[in-house]
């Protein structure tokens, strides 16, 4: 069997056509935008996998058009001999000649069966497939038997259910019928995804196929173990109820990548000549063996001339080289943003559509990319697979580990081109640059105030909601932000960590120290545009400007009196509370504010004089 498989591969039996699905222009219009994106992603990924396995010699026209962002139906083939001069080179299968294609309006069951028998492809149980109203399902046989796959390409513009048999004459009005002969494992073996995961561990095609298969089983139970393409197709394409325009499409090609899996599955029917000691996989043909072997050997023969980075295949090198030349051929029609790879464009377009097809089965949170879902699920599992070798701290994402390691190396690769300040994270640079641009993209829906950081907006909104989630464990006082709580703690501890280098005066808050330093320099950068008075900090200017505007936003809840400054309100509230924290050392009198105490102390000073 292994010899026969290698012979089949050498004759071109395993090609891109085995893992591709064509749509006519009319059929393409039935697809939703998200399904078109999925189609593009899967077709390009299938081609990459073929390249990786060494099974693709020349790039198909379909791939070229998909890479250019064009519609795939532009490469719709006319399957009759008269409409395709280069038919034999397209199908790439020497055993199949154009006489296999029957370009007639109607063809009877007997005629098709007669042609099958004439080519030695008679299957006694194949006739049973004709009983199911043209739903040409994958027909199960054992691994040693021939398997007939029927793909019908038909016109849908008439709105007729062309693939149904009429009761009289049992005729099949098909545009054309293409019959290919393959050897495949049983359906039970096809469902052993763990085998395929060894060969394609990160393949999104497998992931999507598993999902669809699970959904199908939940709908139909275990009554039938054969694949029902029409079930998948009707669900995924959004066909109106009662119509079955594509019943005979082999839609599983799009998601199962079955031809390559069939080749790998052959390892379970006998000893094969090429095997790996590293992973236990065996391959029936040398081209299967040599390409995956590069994973274990680390061989990367294709090196970039610009940066020296190496790749296992020239296809991946070509994609990488776009980073140097700046080529971004895939452009978003919504915002004109361009990308180097079509897969990146498809992911980006979900921002505009809002599509989040990957949902967490633990909490229901949905994501636009499968990779984001995998990272999120580690929150539930507690898995942190990325560990720092320096301090053994573990992380859920490799990107977080890379960022953390810069603490140890001191690397700050992101530099501001305005002031030269460098940062260890790109997001930190992006946020910093808003200081120079004045950009404040986060707006409060209550008062319209804008902020440069989302965290600042969140803190501000607590003014409107009254939320104060941070509590002092010493006195029970609550604060809106953790920084306010930290500053408050220093009242209890007496800590003043911020010291002026000029006069030695210490402060509990860094901002107060900054304002203090301006008193030494005489710097007053904040000037009132009404009277020209200047101030050392912006908050002083804001308070001053209320004199001109008459604004008094701070109102006493006891008597209704309003004030320009919040400090004035606090001093006033001590009158209602009877609080007098400032005591005269001479006579023992108490006062509600320090200015009242100072006025009082002048009396004692005059008495001594």
Swiss-Prot record:
The UniProt record lists the keyword Chloroplast: no
Gene3D superfamilies, alphabetized: 6.10.140.140, Classic Zinc Finger (3.30.160.60)
Keyword line: DNA-binding, Metal-binding, Nucleus, Repeat, Transcription, Transcription regulation, Zinc, Zinc-finger
Coiled-coil portions: none
GO annotations of cellular component type: nucleus
Stretches annotated zinc finger (C2H2-type): 274-296, 302-324, 330-352, 358-380, 386-408, 414-436, 442-464, 470-492, 498-520, 526-548, 554-576, 582-604
Compartments in which it is found: Nucleus
Metal-binding is among the record's keywords: yes
Record-level GO BP terms: regulation of transcription by RNA polymerase II
InterPro entries in UniProt: KRAB, KRAB_dom_sf, Znf_C2H2_sf, Znf_C2H2_type
KRAB domain residues: 14-123
MF terms (GO), sorted A to Z: DNA-binding transcription factor activity, RNA polymerase II-specific; RNA polymerase II cis-regulatory region sequence-specific DNA binding; zinc ion binding
Superkingdom field: Eukaryota
Role according to the record: May be involved in transcriptional regulation.
PANTHER family: ZINC FINGER AND SCAN DOMAIN-CONTAINING, ZINC FINGER PROTEIN 983
UniProt family annotation: Belongs to the krueppel C2H2-type zinc-finger protein family.
Official protein name in the record: Zinc finger protein 527
């Amino acid at each position: 069997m292994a010899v026969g498989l290698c012979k089949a591969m050498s004759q071109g039996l395993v090609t891109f056509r085995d893992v591709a699905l064509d749509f006519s222009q009319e059929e393409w219009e039935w697809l939703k935008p998200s399904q078109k994106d999925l189609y593009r992603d899967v077709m390009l990924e299938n081609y990459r996998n073929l390249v990786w396995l060494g099974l693709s010699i020349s790039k198909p026209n379909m791939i070229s058009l998909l890479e250019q962002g064009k519609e795939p139906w532009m490469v719709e083939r006319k399957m009759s001999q008269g409409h395709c001069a280069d038919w034999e080179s397209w199908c790439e299968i020497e055993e199949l000649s154009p006489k296999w294609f029957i370009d007639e309006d109607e063809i009877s069951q007997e005629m098709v069966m007669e042609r099958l028998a004439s080519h030695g492809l008679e299957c006694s149980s194949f006739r049973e497939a004709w009983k199911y109203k043209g739903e040409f399902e994958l027909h199960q046989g054992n691994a040693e038997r021939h398997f007939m796959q029927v793909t019908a390409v038909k016109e849908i513009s008439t709105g007729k259910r062309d693939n149904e048999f009429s009761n009289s004459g049992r005729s099949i009005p098909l545009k054309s019928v293409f019959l290919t002969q393959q050897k495949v494992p049983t359906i039970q073996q096809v469902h052993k995804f763990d085998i395929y995961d060894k060969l394609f561990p990160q393949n999104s095609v497998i992931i999507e196929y598993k999902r669809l298969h699970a959904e199908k089983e939940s709908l139909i139970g275990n009554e039938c173990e054969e694949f029902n393409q029409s079930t998948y197709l009707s669900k995924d394409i959004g066909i109106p109820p009662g119509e079955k325009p594509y019943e005979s499409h082999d839609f599983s090609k799009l998601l199962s990548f079955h031809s390559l899996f069939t080749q790998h599955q052959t390892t379970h029917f006998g000893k094969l000549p090429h095997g790996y000691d590293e992973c236990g996989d065996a391959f029936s043909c040398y081209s299967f063996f040599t390409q995956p072997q590069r994973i274990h050997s680390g061989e990367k023969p294709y090196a970039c001339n610009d940066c020296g980075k190496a790749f296992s295949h020239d296809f991946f090198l070509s994609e990488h080289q776009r980073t140097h030349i700046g080529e971004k051929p895939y452009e978003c029609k919504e915002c004109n943003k361009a990308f180097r790879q079509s897969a990146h464009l498809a992911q980006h377009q979900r921002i505009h559509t809002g599509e989040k097809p990957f949902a967490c089965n633990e909490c229901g949170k949905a994501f636009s990319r499968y990779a984001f879902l995998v990272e999120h699920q580690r929150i539930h599992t507690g898995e942190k697979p990325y560990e720092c070798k320096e301090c053994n701290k573990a992380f859920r994402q490799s990107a977080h580990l890379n960022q953390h390691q810069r603490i140890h190396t001191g690397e700050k690769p992101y530099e501001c081109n305005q002031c030269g300040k460098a940062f260890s994270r790109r997001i930190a640079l992006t946020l910093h640059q808003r200081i120079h641009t004045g950009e404040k993209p986060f707006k409060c829906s209550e008062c319209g105030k804008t902020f440069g950081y989302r965290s600042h907006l969140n803190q501000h909104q607590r003014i409107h909601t009254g939320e104060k989630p941070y509590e002092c464990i010493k006195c029970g006082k609550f604060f809106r932000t953790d920084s306010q709580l930290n500053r408050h703690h220093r009242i209890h501890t007496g800590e003043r960590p911020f010291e002026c280098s000029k006069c030695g005066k210490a402060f509990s808050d860094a901002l107060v120290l900054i304002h203090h330093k301006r008193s030494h320099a005489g710097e007053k950068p904040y000037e009132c545009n009404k009277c020209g008075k200047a101030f050392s900090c912006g908050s002083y200017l804001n308070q001053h400007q209320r004199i001109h505007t008459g604004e008094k936003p701070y109102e006493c809840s006891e008597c209704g009196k309003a004030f320009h400054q919040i400090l004035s309100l606090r001093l006033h509230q001590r009158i209602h509370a009877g609080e007098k924290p400032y005591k005269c050392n001479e006579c023992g009198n108490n006062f509600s504010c320090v200015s009242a105490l100072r006025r009082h102390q002048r009396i004692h000073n005059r008495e001594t004089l």
